[in-house]
Each structure stands twice: as structure tokens, then as C-alpha cells.
């Protein structure tokens, strides 16, 4: 439904531009896009794709046809279906969205659609590379780059958290009406190293986001949570001094997160 709404909006925005085109090819492209929209509304996504591609062939400089192509392919992808045919359709949509970005690098819809599709087909490494590429793109404004770094930080936090919070690693001791939590080293050293790698990398990503947008509440929140992860890992390794230092940094980050959150609240 969201894709359909976006497609209809695109048609509406394109109509004045297309109406001004004098050439036969451009007029034919307009008709093909109208047919694509009609087929899309009827749920005939493959037909919509064919019309969209024909429009692009007729008018390669058309500014809206590439998005028609990408959306109509995307609409044929079925979330949760991991058959080779469906995965291939997702990859086809990714290529179409990337073609848009080659012409318009700042196109948010195309960027987010690629990220969504990589995540949907479980291509975690490609997703990370995609988001990291966005984060490092100096032609994109700082807020969008910071958002990308924050997404990476969130994934790294999740990677560590899923390991440190496992029942075998997190021990809760109850004495009377008080409970204390401690963390023990995983039996598999590789698990510990994986969590440590994720947490350290996540802290770097959060700091990059904050450097670009110092008032980004979500970036500060992830920095705070990642420092807590690093403190857990220091406890697991028996490094008491480093754990105390990380807890100090955690408290500082938590305090700053609260300040940023308060500053972002609308004034009465």
C-alpha cells in the first residue's frame, strides 16, 4: 500500500513535467507510465514493470521512470519467501534502486529501499557495507550521514548484547530482597571476541555520529549502551580497573544523553 501511494504521488508530480514534453518518444513514455500506474493499481506488478521499462527505453532522460521501474520490481518481492526466484527479484529491485542513486545520490527512498531489501534477504554484510558507504559519503548532509553511523552502532550494540545477556553469561544472585548481576566469560572464546569486536566497533560508529551531529539523541543513547556492553565484557575478562573506567564513561555518556534529550524537548 505504501509503494502504491508513493507511485501515485510520483505520477501526480510528474504530470506537469510530462505534459510539457513535445517529442513523440516522450509522449509515448508518458502513456507507458500511465499504463504502468494502472497495472500497479490492479496488482499486475509484472505488467507494471514492463510498461515502466518501456517508458525508460523511450525516454532515457525521464526523471520518474527509473523509480517506476524500481518500485514495480520491489512490489513483486514477497517478504519472508526465501525461494531463489524471490531472492532474485529482491536483487533485481536493489539494482534498479542503485541505478537511481547513480543519478541522484541523495535519494532517500532508493537508499532506504536497498537497505530494507538487503536486511529482508539476510545479506547482513552487504547491508553493513551499504550503510557504511552512506555514512562515509561526504556529498550527503551530516544529519543523514550521522543517521547511517547510528544504524551501524545499533547493529553492533545488538551483536554484543545478544551475547552478554545469554543466561549462561549473565548470572543473577538474590540475597534477601536484593539481587545482583554479574557476568562470566563464555565457554567459547570466539563468542567473547565477537562481542568485544562488535562493541568496540559500535563505540567508534556512535562517536562518528556524534562528531557529525553533537545533538543526536539516538547516537548518544547508543554510545551509552555500548559503553555498558564494554563494561560487561571487561568484567568477563576480569579487568576490574578497566571496568571501573568504562562505568565512569558510561555515567558521563548517560548524563550527556539526558541533557541532549532535555534540550530537544519543545519548550512550553
Q: What positions do the PLM features span?
A:
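Alpha-helical segment of the N-proximal tetratricopeptide repeat
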Residues: 27-54, 58, 79-82, 187-194
Amino acid at each position: 500500500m505504501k509503494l502504491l501511494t508513493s507511485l501515485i504521488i510520483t505520477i501526480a508530480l510528474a504530470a506537469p513535467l510530462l505534459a510539457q514534453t513535445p517529442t513523440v518518444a516522450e509522449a509515448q513514455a508518458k502513456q507507458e507510465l500511465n499504463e504502468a500506474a494502472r497495472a500497479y493499481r490492479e496488482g499486475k506488478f509484472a505488467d507494471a514493470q514492463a510498461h515502466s521499462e518501456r517508458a525508460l527505453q523511450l525516454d532515457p532522460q525521464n526523471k520518474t521512470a527509473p523509480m517506476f521501474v524500481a518500485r514495480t520490481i520491489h512490489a513483486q518481492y514477497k517478504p519472508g519467501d526465501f525461494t531463489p526466484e524471490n531472492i532474485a527479484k529482491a536483487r533485481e529491485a536493489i539494482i534498479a534502486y542503485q541505478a537511481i542513486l547513480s543519478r541522484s545520490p541523495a535519494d532517500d527512498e532508493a537508499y532506504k529501499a536497498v537497505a530494507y531489501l538487503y536486511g529482508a534477504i539476510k545479506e547482513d554484510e552487504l547491508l553493513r557495507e551499504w550503510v557504511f558507504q552512506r555514512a562515509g559519503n561526504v556529498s550527503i548532509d551530516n544529519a543523514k550521514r550521522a543517521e547511517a553511523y547510528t544504524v551501524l552502532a545499533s547493529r553492533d550494540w545488538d551483536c554484543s548484547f545478544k551475547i552478554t545477556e545469554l543466561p549462561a553469561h549473565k548470572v543473577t544472585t538474590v540475597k534477601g530482597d536484593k539481587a545482583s548481576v554479574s557476568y562470566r566469560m563464555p565457554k567459547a572464546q570466539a563468542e567473547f571476541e565477537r562481542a568485544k569486536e562488535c562493541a568496540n566497533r559500535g563505540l567508534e560508529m556512535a562517536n562518528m555520529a556524534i562528531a557529525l551531529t553533537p545533538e543526536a539523541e539516538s547516537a548518544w543513547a547508543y554510545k551509552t549502551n555500548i559503553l555498558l556492553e564494554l563494561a560487561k565484557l571487561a568484567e568477563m575478562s576480569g579487568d576490574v580497573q578497566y571496568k571501573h573506567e568504562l562505568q565512569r564513561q558510561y555515567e558521563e555518556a548517560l548524563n550527556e544523553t539526558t541533557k541532549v534529550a532535555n534540550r530537544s524537548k519543545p519548550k512550553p
